[in-house]
């Protein structure tokens, strides 16, 4: 390389380093971008709501992961009064601010929790420039829209931004709710965002935007001055309509779980062993009985192929069943899988098998379907449920499979365990 080219390369490198130093200094001057996730332990509509799972993950962990996925967010904080939420949040990578009881009741506002978190952070020496306020009860936070909003506020193009989706809906209200003093029928329907006498086509209308509650981004200084999240130049961060669900009741939780199964790619389950129940997992939980009292069950050949693939990969498997019927052992022998059946205490049996195999419980997946599986599900790192499992099992599961027992659920689990 010529001396001129060397000098040019050195100059370019020096200028790049100077630019990076200047950018870092500017960021220091502006203060950090902090994501704050309020997540109290109490909830009336959905008990322990922030710890309920969607897509196999507690809601508060989903929010933490969404924030961590945004490169421009420097610090992720969970404000909580609850020990379990705090532990889950720390494990997910968040810093925890303990919220006092006075700010943890049903009437406490999100703003009060955010102000308290800012005070705690600043007393610890942090300088905050921009706040991203995320709600754990919104399980689908679009990280691309969140990242764009953080940039827009950080670059000074907006003071406050909210997640919202486009809507062309015709909104109506009741007369008494709109104007209690008006001389109209209190139950009369009143057009809100349109002229009731004119019905334009969708393509001829301008859209409105419905706030989703998933996230808000704003300048910290402006928030302190205003005392609320909307001030100055307010802009919309547009998000897909399907992400707008916010969980306030059990039905919304079920819908969110269904949406997660539709829209999210299943993650690999990195375990060293697979343990399954038999009835309701390898079978559809039904049986036929002949005149001699002999029970027969239906099993899935697809599951059988999955078990053979797991065996070839050298990953241990065990069938652990309460059932004493000889069909359990017959199927296990056919699959060439060890079996413990006629077991009433599944937890103790599983602990003993894991100890003998030298495999930590945290690295075992247990696949179950009914309440007698709960003790085993609670001690493993990966509690898994078939799609049609008992509600208590679905709630205990880290992952809920898409397939039902006896219809490929075992194969589905194995395909998520095997690498590649």
Tell me what each language-model feature is.
Residues 5-30, 177-189:
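Intrinsically disordered, low-complexity terminal tails and inter-domain linkers enriched
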Residues 9-12, 26-47, 276-279:
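N-terminal nucleotide-binding beta1-loop-alpha1 segment
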Residues 21-22, 219-221, 241-276:
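Non-catalytic pre-domain segments flanking phosphatase-related domains
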Residues 32-79, 297, 303:
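N-terminal glycine-rich phosphate-binding loop and ensuing alpha1 helix
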Residues 77, 83-132, 140, 148, ...:
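Short phosphate-binding loop-to-helix
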Residues 110-112, 116, 138-239:
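Conserved core of the sugar-phosphate nucleotidyltransferase
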Residues 269-286, 410:
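Asp-based phosphoryl-transfer active-site loop
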Residues 289-300, 306, 325-327, 334-340, ...:
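Mg2+-dependent phosphoryl-transfer enzymes with acidic/Ser/Thr/Gly-rich catalytic loops
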């Amino acid at each position: 390389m010529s001396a001129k080219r060397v000098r040019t390369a050195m100059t370019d490198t020096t200028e790049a380093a100077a630019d990076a130093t200047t950018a870092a200094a500017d960021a220091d001057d502006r203060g950090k971008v902090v994501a704050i996730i309020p997540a109290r332990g109490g909830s009336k509509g959905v008990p322990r709501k922030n710890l309920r799972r969607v897509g196999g993950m507690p809601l508060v962990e989903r929010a933490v992961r969404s924030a961590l996925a945004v490169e421009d967010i420097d610090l992720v904080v969970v404000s909580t009064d609850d020990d379990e939420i705090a532990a889950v949040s720390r494990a997910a990578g968040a810093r925890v601010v303990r919220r006092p009881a006075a700010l943890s009741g049903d009437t406490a506002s999100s703003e009060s929790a955010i102000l308290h978190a800012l005070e705690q952070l600043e007393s610890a020496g942090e300088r905050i420039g921009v706040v991203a306020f995320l709600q754990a009860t919104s399980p689908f936070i679009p990280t691309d829209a969140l990242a764009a909003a953080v940039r827009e506020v950080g670059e000074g193009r907006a003071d406050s931004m909210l997640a919202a989706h486009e809507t062309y809906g015709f909104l109506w209200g009741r007369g008494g709710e709109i104007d209690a003093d008006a001389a109209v029928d209190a139950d009369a329907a009143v057009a809100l965002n349109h002229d009731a006498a004119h019905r334009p086509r969708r393509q001829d209308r301008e859209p409105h935007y419905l706030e989703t509650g998933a996230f808000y981004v704003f300048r910290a200084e402006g928030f302190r001055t205003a005392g609320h999240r909307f001030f100055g130049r307010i802009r919309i961060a547009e998000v897909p309509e399907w992400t707008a669900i916010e969980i306030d009741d059990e039905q919304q939780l079920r819908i969110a779980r269904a949406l997660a199964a539709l829209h999210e790619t299943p993650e690999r389950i990195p375990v060293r062993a697979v343990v399954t129940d038999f009835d309701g997992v390898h079978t559809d939980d039904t049986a036929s009985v002949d005149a001699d009292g002999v029970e027969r069950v239906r099993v899935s050949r697809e599951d059988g192929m999955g078990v053979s693939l797991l065996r070839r990969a050298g990953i241990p498997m065990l069938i652990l069943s309460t059932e004493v019927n000889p069909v359990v052992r017959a199927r296990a022998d056919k699959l060439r899988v060890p079996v413990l059946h006629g077991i009433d205490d599944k937890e103790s049996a599983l602990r003993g098998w894991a100890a003998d195999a030298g495999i930590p419980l945290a690295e075992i997946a247990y696949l179950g379907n009914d309440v007698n599986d709960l003790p085993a599900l609670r001690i493993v790192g990966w509690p898994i449920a078939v799609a049609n499992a008992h509600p208590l099992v679905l709630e205990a599961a880290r992952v809920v499979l898409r397939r039902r027992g006896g219809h490929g659920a075992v194969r589905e689990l194995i395909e998520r365990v095997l690498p590649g």
